[in-house]
């Protein structure tokens, strides 16, 4: 008798995705981040659901409702801080996941890669709208500054901004619609993640060597289920350590001041995970140019597969490309630091140089080094 997990229509999908899935025998811990992102998403949806039961999306009561959650709701404080810090861990996993893809040439699966880029944009939009909901000073001014960037779009810009705001400034209508979108987007993210997996399972996973692994596959369960369980344990350990010991470490103190349209904070800045893009935005004097650079900083990933010049897939055996990759990582850390600094000398010039270097590495240096490595190997 055939096992029910191989015959039942629903069980078969789960079986082919998580149990009998043929996986390369040599994938490292860098391949854990897909499952960790899934766990992050589940944590965010569950904690968000419980927060939404007590939150009110009205400008007069939003801030108070968050205070009420932390003070009066049973374990409300832990749910709120798990949600806030869960977002930070979500982005850490996202950046490491994308970095893994860049390093090992996983972008050579174009459908999976492009869905991944759409996922990244969607998660960033979700996180931005979530940051507005507590209606603190940084929530309000962050929403004002970032939505205002759309006014740089020629001809329709101003109308577009007022349409998004639902009025002539960030107000009650804006908060209500941001809450609506923040609630629905994670479910769209879940659907996109399923499509991401669907495309991945069409080709099978890449592996550190970049060589096709069809001749050496192992079943996903028990090998990688156990490996993913260890990753999940470490992720939850990191999250709970952050939540229970320093829940406000990654937040902005200004967000504990209720939103006041008449008082601008000295330094308006987004959450830490957007600082690199914010630094690129600020490094260009023109408003429209800055907005374009901001969008390009992420969408540039879409043309990475077209710029792959090396005869090898990953960077495992390409020391020159490895140097460039780690230079890119250092550059992104520099941009993150600059994004949190005031707009004054020497931060302006450092930000501009780091922004130029970011695009130069991805668009010029990496393809050029790929060609050089081919010629060094006489390929």
From Swiss-Prot:
InterPro entries: Cyt_b/b6_C, Cyt_b/b6_C_sf, Cyt_b/b6_N, Cytb/b6-like_sf, Cytochrome_b, Cytochrome_b_C_euk/bac, Cytochrome_b_N_euk/bac, Di-haem_cyt_TM. The gene is MT-CYB. The cytochrome bc1 complex contains 11 subunits: 3 respiratory subunits (MT-CYB, CYC1 and UQCRFS1), 2 core proteins (UQCRC1 and UQCRC2) and 6 low-molecular weight proteins (UQCRH/QCR6, UQCRB/QCR7, UQCRQ/QCR8, UQCR10/QCR9, UQCR11/QCR10 and a cleavage product of UQCRFS1). This cytochrome bc1 complex then forms a dimer. CDD domains: cytochrome_b_C (cd00290), Cytochrome_b_N (cd00284). It comes from the Eukaryota. GO terms for biological process: mitochondrial electron transport, ubiquinol to cytochrome c. This is Cytochrome b. A ubiquinone binds at residue 201. PROSITE patterns: CYTB_CTER (PS51003), CYTB_NTER (PS51002). Its cofactor is heme b. It is a multi-pass membrane protein. Belongs to the cytochrome b family. Component of the ubiquinol-cytochrome c reductase complex (complex III or cytochrome b-c1 complex) that is part of the mitochondrial respiratory chain. The b-c1 complex mediates electron transfer from ubiquinol to cytochrome c. Contributes to the generation of a proton gradient across the mitochondrial membrane that is then used for ATP synthesis. Keywords: Electron transport, Heme, Iron, Membrane, Metal-binding, Mitochondrion, Mitochondrion inner membrane, Respiratory chain, Transmembrane, Transmembrane helix, Transport, Ubiquinone.
């Amino acid at each position: 008798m055939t096992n029910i997990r191989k015959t039942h229509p629903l069980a078969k999908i789960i079986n082919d995705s998580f149990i009998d899935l043929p996986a390369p025998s040599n994938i490292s811990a860098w391949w854990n981040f897909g499952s960790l992102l899934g766990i992050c998403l589940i944590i965010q949806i569950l904690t968000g659901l419980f927060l939404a039961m007590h939150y009110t999306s009205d400008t007069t009561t939003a801030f108070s409702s968050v205070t009420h959650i932390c003070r009066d709701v049973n374990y409300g404080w832990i749910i709120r801080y798990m949600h806030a810090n869960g977002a930070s861990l979500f982005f850490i996993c996202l950046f490491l996941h994308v970095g893994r893809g860049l390093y090992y040439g996983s972008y050579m699966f174009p459908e999976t890669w492009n869905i991944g880029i759409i996922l990244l944009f969607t998660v960033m939009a979700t996180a931005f709208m979530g940051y507005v909901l507590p209606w603190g000073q940084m929530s309000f001014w962050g929403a004002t500054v970032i939505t205002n960037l759309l006014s740089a779009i020629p001809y329709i810009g101003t109308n577009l901004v007022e349409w998004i705001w639902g009025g002539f400034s960030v107000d009650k209508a804006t908060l209500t619609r941001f809450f609506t979108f923040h609630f629905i987007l994670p479910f769209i993210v879940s659907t996109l993640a399923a499509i991401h997996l669907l495309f991945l399972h069409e080709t099978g996973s890449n592996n550190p060597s970049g060589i096709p692994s069809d001749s050496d596959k192992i079943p996903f369960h028990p090998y990688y289920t156990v490996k993913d369980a260890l990753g999940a344990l470490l992720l939850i350990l990191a999250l709970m350590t952050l939540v229970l010991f320093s829940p406000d470490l990654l937040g902005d103190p200004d967000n504990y001041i209720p939103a006041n349209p008449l008082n601008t904070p000295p330094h308006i800045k987004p959450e830490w995970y957007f600082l690199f893009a914010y630094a690129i935005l600020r490094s260009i004097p023109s408003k429209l140019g800055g907005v374009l650079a901001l969008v390009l900083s992420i969408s540039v990933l879409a043309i990475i597969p077209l710029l792959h010049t090396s005869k090898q897939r990953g960077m495992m055996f390409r020391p020159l490309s490895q140097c460039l990759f780690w230079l890119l990582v250092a550059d992104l850390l520099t941009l993150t630091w600059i994004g949190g600094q005031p707009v004054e000398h020497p931060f302006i010039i450092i930000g501009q140089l780091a922004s130029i270097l970011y695009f130069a590495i991805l668009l010029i240096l990496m393809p050029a080094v790929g060609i050089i490595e081919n010629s060094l190997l006489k390929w």
